[in-house]
């Protein structure tokens, strides 16, 4: 008689991994998944399957389970609630013991939590809505290279949002002409200009030429305005070694900031670059190219607030966060929810803003949200009100599309911003009086008046 000392076969996940009586620990990583089970699969089984497949489980019982303590290491689905207004959708809450994750590795955290489970047959769809990162795990990350306060001190710019501009056309300019556009924008009054996310090192403009001409533009604009200026030099490359080579060259030129596409570049590369930037005094601007592939579907994928939290752990000083302006009111609350998760040290659970867990960042530096995409001077009051001082407002077409050229476009944006900040400080209501504030300012700024005229037809 052969006895192997364990019961072979396939058993329901919920027998092991659904534990509604479990009390979460302060050291657990908590996840909120939006689960859409296949017809006939009970939500408890679906939630337990997610917990199992993203932690210690496999599809059948294995004898090596007896060589470890599953109770210590398994993920647990500890609560399930139906999603209001959606048929057959549930929020499954899963707790993971901290021992399952390598310290200081966003890569490992995601490989575990979202690595395999999304292709699971028992589920029609699955979306990771939020993560609670416990302080014990947060403390294993360096986080942003510098954070909001250090950035302000480096740039000597306070009590207002920062202004940026993406250089367009994004592909096709020679390095010399590119540098010229950078100079004109910075000279006109912007704080930053930006490489587009897909500007790396192409035949029409190799990275080293671009870096040199942009640095020249930067120093010329600084000398003429007396303000510190920056251009986000995109260091994203095909290998980590090449990426760091570009960052090192930027540091040798003495520029203040470099840039990385963190999703296409990957978290491992991003964390390496963030460490280099802190060690060498460079700020790090992060672009989220590819995010919509992951976060756009409402019932499948990963919500951007999770990608934003992951970036704060991996490291970056700025990240693109959408604009809110002109979108629906509900979107505004959700966006401001993850903007707070980027900037603040402690964020309370607030389901109306999409925040499923209270998050304590235990003094990990904050990140400036970057509002960019289809915005112009008429949006300035709303942007100033919504995002507040700790933000970067980026106008690409809204600068370079000015009828008189790049420098006047920059002047128009700077005048509009200063007018909005002054009006706010005087106690005026930007939401109600915004258009009036811009009109008043345009009376003494012909550049702003021309910008107002060009974009007056474009409604919020």
UniProtKB/Swiss-Prot annotation:
The disulfide bond which can form in the large chain dimeric partners within the hexadecamer appears to be associated with oxidative stress and protein turnover. Keywords: Calvin cycle, Carbon dioxide fixation, Chloroplast, Disulfide bond, Lyase, Magnesium, Metal-binding, Methylation, Monooxygenase, Oxidoreductase, Photorespiration, Photosynthesis, Plastid. The record marks 327 as: Transition state stabilizer. Its cofactor is Mg(2+). PANTHER family: RIBULOSE BISPHOSPHATE CARBOXYLASE, RIBULOSE BISPHOSPHATE CARBOXYLASE LARGE CHAIN. The basic functional RuBisCO is composed of a large chain homodimer in a 'head-to-tail' conformation. In form I RuBisCO this homodimer is arranged in a barrel-like tetramer with the small subunits forming a tetrameric 'cap' on each end of the 'barrel'. This is Ribulose bisphosphate carboxylase large chain. It comes from Halesia carolina. The gene is rbcL.
């Amino acid at each position: 008689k052969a006895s192997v000392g364990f019961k072979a076969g396939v058993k329901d996940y919920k027998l092991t991994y659904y534990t509604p009586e479990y009390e979460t620990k302060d050291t657990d990583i908590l996840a909120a998944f939006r689960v859409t089970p296949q017809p006939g699969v009970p939500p408890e089984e679906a939630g337990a399957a997610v917990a199992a497949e993203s932690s210690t489980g496999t599809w059948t019982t294995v004898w090596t389970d007896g060589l470890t303590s599953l109770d210590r290491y398994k993920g647990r689905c500890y609560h399930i609630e139906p999603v209001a207004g959606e048929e057959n959708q549930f929020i499954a809450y899963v707790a993971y013991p901290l021992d399952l994750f390598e310290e200081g590795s966003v890569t490992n955290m995601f490989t575990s939590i979202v690595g395999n489970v999304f292709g699971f047959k028992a589920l029609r769809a699955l979306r990771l809505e939020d993560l609670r990162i416990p302080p014990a795990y947060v403390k294993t990350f360096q986080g942003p290279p510098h954070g909001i306060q250090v950035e302000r001190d480096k740039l000597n710019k306070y009590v207002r949002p920062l202004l940026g501009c993406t250089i367009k056309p994004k592909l096709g300019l020679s390095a010399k002409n590119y540098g010229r556009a950078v100079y004109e924008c910075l000279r006109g009054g912007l704080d930053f200009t930006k490489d587009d996310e897909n500007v790396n090192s192409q035949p029409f403009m190799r990275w080293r030429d671009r870096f040199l001409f942009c640095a020249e533009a930067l120093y010329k604009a600084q000398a003429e305005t007396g303000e510190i200026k920056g251009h986000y030099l995109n260091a994203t490359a095909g290998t980590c070694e090449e990426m760091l080579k570009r960052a090192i060259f930027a540091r040798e030129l003495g520029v203040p900031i470099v840039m990385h596409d963190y999703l296409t570049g990957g978290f491992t590369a991003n964390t390496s670059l963030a460490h280099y930037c802190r060690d060498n005094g460079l700020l790090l601007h992060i672009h989220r190219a590819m995010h919509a592939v992951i976060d756009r579907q409402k019932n499948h994928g990963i919500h951007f607030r999770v990608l934003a939290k992951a970036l704060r752990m991996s490291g970056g000083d700025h990240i693109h966060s959408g604009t809110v302006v002109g979108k629906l009111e509900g979107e505004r609350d959700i966006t401001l929810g993850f903007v707070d998760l980027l900037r603040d040290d402690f964020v309370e659970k607030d389901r109306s803003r999409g925040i499923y867990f209270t998050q304590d960042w235990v003094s990990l530096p904050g990140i400036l949200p970057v509002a960019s995409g289809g915005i112009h001077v008429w949006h300035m009051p709303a942007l100033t009100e919504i995002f507040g001082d700790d933000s970067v407002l980026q106008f690409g077409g809204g600068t370079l599309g000015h009828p008189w050229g790049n420098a006047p476009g920059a002047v128009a944006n700077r005048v509009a911003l200063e007018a909005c900040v002054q009006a706010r400080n005087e106690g005026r209501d930007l939401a109600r009086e915004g258009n009036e504030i811009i009109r008043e300012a345009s009376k003494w700024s012909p550049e702003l008046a021309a910008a107002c005229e060009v974009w007056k037809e474009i409604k919020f």
